[in-house]
Amino acid sequence: MLIPVVCFTCGFPIGTYAAIFDKARTEYIKTKMGGTLPQNIPLDASLQIELKDLITALGIPMRVCCRTHLITTLDYRKYY
């Protein structure tokens, strides 16, 4: 699924920050997985990776609705 260009609720331009967040998310997931890509290890249902603080750490000024769109959109081709 693609990240929307603007937030459906408030109209914030999410698309301008999508590439920055995607790169940071990939690196964050790789560090949480021990330096390997998720496609190279078996799926573990108990693994929890919190992404809510990643947007704050990047300094992206977003509301909760925008964070929901950005965090829940995942391009499965990169990980599976």
Swiss-Prot record:
Query: What's in the GO CC field?
Result: DNA-directed RNA polymerase complex; host cell cytoplasm
What highest taxon heads this organism's lineage? Viruses
InterPro entries, A to Z: RNA_pol_su_RPB10, RNA_pol_suN_Zn-BS, RPABC5/Rpb10
Locations listed in the record: Host cytoplasm
| Residues the entry annotates as binding Zn(2+) | 7, 10, 65-66
| Pfam families registered for this protein in UniProt | RNA_pol_N
Keywords of the record: DNA-directed RNA polymerase, Host cytoplasm, Metal-binding, Transcription, Viral transcription, Zinc
Cysteine disulfide partners in this protein: none
Molecular function GO terms recorded: DNA binding; DNA-directed RNA polymerase activity; zinc ion binding
Principal localization reads host cell
Example GO biological process: DNA-templated transcription
**Subunit annotation:** Part of the viral DNA-directed RNA polymerase that consists of 8 polII-like subunits (RPB1, RPB2, RPB3, RPB5, RPB6, RPB7, RPB9, RPB10), a capping enzyme and a termination factor.
- The family this protein is said to belong to: Belongs to the archaeal RpoN/eukaryotic RPB10 RNA polymerase subunit family.
Reported function: Component of the DNA-directed RNA polymerase (RNAP) that catalyzes the transcription in the cytoplasm of viral DNA into RNA using the four ribonucleoside triphosphates as substrates.
Q: What is this protein called?
A: DNA-directed RNA polymerase RPB10 homolog
Q: Which organism is it from?
A: African swine fever virus (isolate Tick/South Africa/Pretoriuskop Pr4/1996) (ASFV)
